[in-house]
């Protein structure tokens, strides 16, 4: 037992919470830009958009489109991203220790992401998480995706865990909105990807944590239970 006092089930977002996937997405975007004769985009320009989804990433890659992204461009992004998947991504510092501590406490953890399920399922084996994660819900696994509460409600129900015994950790406002709508407690992962005008203090999360290691503090979980 780790003695940290985790709830029965800790659910996580993937990109920007457990996984720093920005390098793979940057490689994808710059392949798209190179094909159009555009200069490479620096990581710092793209990083804030990583948690916003494939449409937002495609729009960020080509600001001149003013957000008017054709479905074909989104498909191109997803196809190229599948080729780049896992080449440069890595868990955020401290994630491996965190997941091990949850397991040592006798609790379970799972992933609820808006990333398409077929992509998420390719990532997990490369990290050794496919046999450890209790559940994986992708953005297209169900009729609704975050910020709708259904993915979180479904994950808890599938694992037979009461909502009151779950906590969701995410780095985007839609993560916190989904948890609140589901009646689930939430933690804002401040190490994730955010736009300059995002204000996590006003998202309504039950706790804000600056670093993964903050999730190893017993006092945090005591306050959430």
Regions found by a protein language model. Give the residues of each.
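Gly/Ser/Thr-rich helix-start
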Residues: 17, 52-54, 95, 111, ...
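Residue-level detector of anion-binding/catalytic polar loops
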Residues: 39, 108, 185
């Amino acid at each position: 037992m780790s003695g940290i006092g985790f709830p029965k089930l800790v659910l996580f977002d993937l990109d920007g919470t457990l996984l720093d996937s920005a390098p793979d997405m940057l490689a994808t975007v710059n392949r798209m830009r190179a094909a159009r004769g555009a200069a490479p985009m620096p990581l710092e320009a793209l990083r804030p958009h990583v948690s916003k989804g494939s449409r937002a990433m495609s729009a960020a890659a080509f600001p001149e489109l003013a957000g008017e992204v054709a479905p074909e461009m989104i498909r191109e992004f997803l196809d190229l991203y599948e080729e780049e998947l896992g080449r440069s991504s890595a868990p955020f510092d401290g994630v491996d220790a965190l997941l091990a501590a949850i397991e040592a406490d006798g609790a379970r953890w799972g992933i609820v992401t808006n990333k398409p399920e077929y992509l998420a399922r390719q990532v997990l084996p490369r990290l050794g998480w496919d046999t450890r994660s209790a559940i994986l819900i992708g953005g297209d696994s169900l009729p609704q995706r975050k910020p709708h509460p259904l993915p979180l409600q479904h994950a808890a129900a599938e694992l037979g865990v009461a909502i009151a015994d779950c906590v969701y950790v995410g780095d985007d406002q839609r993560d916190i909105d989904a948890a609140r709508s589901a009646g689930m407690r939430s933690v804002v992962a401040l190490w994730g990807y955010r736009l300059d005008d995002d204000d996590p203090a006003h998202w309504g999360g039950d706790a804000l944590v600056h670093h993964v290691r903050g999730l190893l503090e017993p006092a945090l979980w005591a306050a959430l239970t």
